[in-house]
UniProtKB/Swiss-Prot annotation:
This is Glycerol-3-phosphate dehydrogenase [NAD(P)+] 1. It holds the Pfam family NAD_Gly3P_dh_C. InterPro entries: 6-PGluconate_DH-like_C_sf (IPR008927), 6PGD_dom2 (IPR013328), G3P_DH_NAD-dep (IPR006168), G3P_DH_NAD-dep_C (IPR006109), G3P_DH_NAD-dep_N (IPR011128), NAD(P)-bd_dom_sf (IPR036291). Keywords: Cytoplasm, Lipid biosynthesis, Lipid metabolism, NAD, NADP, Nucleotide-binding, Oxidoreductase, Phospholipid biosynthesis, Phospholipid metabolism. It is found in: Cytoplasm. Its EC number is 1.1.1.94. The gene is gpsA1. It comes from Sphingopyxis alaskensis (strain DSM 13593 / LMG 18877 / RB2256) (Sphingomonas alaskensis). It catalyses: sn-glycerol 3-phosphate + NAD(+) = dihydroxyacetone phosphate + NADH + H(+); sn-glycerol 3-phosphate + NADP(+) = dihydroxyacetone phosphate + NADPH + H(+). Disulfide bonds: none annotated. PANTHER family: GLYCEROL-3-PHOSPHATE DEHYDROGENASE (PTHR11728), GLYCEROL-3-PHOSPHATE DEHYDROGENASE [NAD(+)] 2, CHLOROPLASTIC (PTHR11728:SF1). One of its GO terms (biological process) is glycerophospholipid metabolic process.
Length: 330
């Protein structure tokens, strides 16, 4: 049985920093790579990340670097890089045999590749896994109770990684359904934007509940069409994450939707953010993949058109409400 003790984190955003703090809180050495020099300097000198995770004190055993070549001699790497930039980082990652645990959510434009698909191309032979579920970074960093899915095709790898990551307040549930975990994470971000639009436009809780329910039906159709298991989509990485991010402005995607619902321009909302609302990038990609697969995803398609500036919120609401009536199971 492999023992994973020495972890590295690739990505210094809020989620990467929170995972690093989770692992370093008991004094274990953790190495984090970030592209931003100011983030690295603050972590090393002040033990905090005021850019992406303000207010969270960090362990002195957490060290940071801007040198990706330094991410070697580690037992496992948690890769927490937004999907639009993931291929470039994987290309630069030094070779090795440490497992890659992908913690970002989304689908690559053009290739329709998920993070694990990119790893097969760019890091062949390296074991890989997915960590996904209902998590807000600031709560994990603060040690609040969290449950999450850890999926790997190799059940032994999933179990060993889960045991290494588990803490009294952080409970990974093991799965072998990698594609289900990836699809749940990608689609829920899109639906969180839709629910934020409902909130921002003042359309009420009934409308939000309907969007969550019908959005979950879209997630399930898309997931099953690509080989995901229904229980994964109904679990932490799917429905659990969907409920969390569709009901709180702490979600970047929900907050982006709120702005759209209030009538703010997508360009302004995106320009004001140093952090990434992953759903804005995932929406057009998942919508295109669904069309190619012949899967009906009207909410996803509508969000894709909204973030592309092709549709006004009022027209989007009318389009969804005027769709033909159908049985609920469809």
């Amino acid at each position: 049985m492999t023992s994973y003790r020495n972890f590295g984190i690739v990505g210094g955003g809020a989620w990467g920093t929170a995972l690093a703090q989770l692992l370093a809180a008991d004094g274990a050495p953790v190495r984090l790579w970030a592209r931003e020099a100011d983030v690295v300097a603050a972590i090393n000198a002040e033990h905090r990340n005021p850019v992406f995770l303000p207010g969270a004190p960090l362990s002195s055993s957490l060290t940071a670097t801007t040198d990706l070549a330094a991410m070697t001699d580690l037992d496992a790497l948690l890769v927490v890089v937004p999907v639009p930039y993931l291929r470039a980082v994987l290309t630069e990652l030094p070779p090795g045999d440490a497992p890659l645990v992908f913690c970002s959510k989304g689908m690559e434009a053009g290739s329709f590749a998920f993070p694990v698909d990119m790893a097969r191309d760019l890091a062949p032979g390296r074991p890989h896994a997915v960590l996904s579920g209902p998590t807000f970074a600031h709560e994990v960093a603060a040690g609040l109770p969290t449950a999450i899915t850890l999926a790997a095709a190799d059940p032994a790898l999933a179990t060993e990684l889960a045991q290494a990551l588990a803490r009294p307040h952080f409970r990974p549930y093991v799965s072998t359904d990698v594609i289900g975990a990836e699809i749940g994470g990608a689609v829920k971000n899109i639906l969180a934007i839709a629910c934020g639009i409902v909130e921002g436009a003042g359309l009420g809780l009934n409308a939000r509940a309907a969007l969550i329910s019908r959005g979950f039906a879209e997630m399930t159709r898309f997931g099953l069409s690509r080989g995901a298991k229904a229980e994964t989509l109904a679990g932490l990485a799917g429905l659990g994450d969907l409920v969390l991010t569709c009901t709180s402005a702490n979600s970047r995607n929900f907050a982006l939707g709120q702005g759209l619902g209030r009538g703010e321009a997508i360009e302004t909302l995106m320009a004001d953010r140093r952090t990434i609302a992953e759903g804005a990038f995932s929406a057009p990609v998942v919508a295109a993949a669904a069309r190619a697969d012949g899967v009906d995803m009207p909410i996803t398609d509508t969000v894709a058109r909204l973030v592309a500036g092709e549709m006004r919120v009022a027209d989007a609401i009318q389009a969804l409400l005027s769709r033909p009536l159908r049985p609920e199971g469809q």
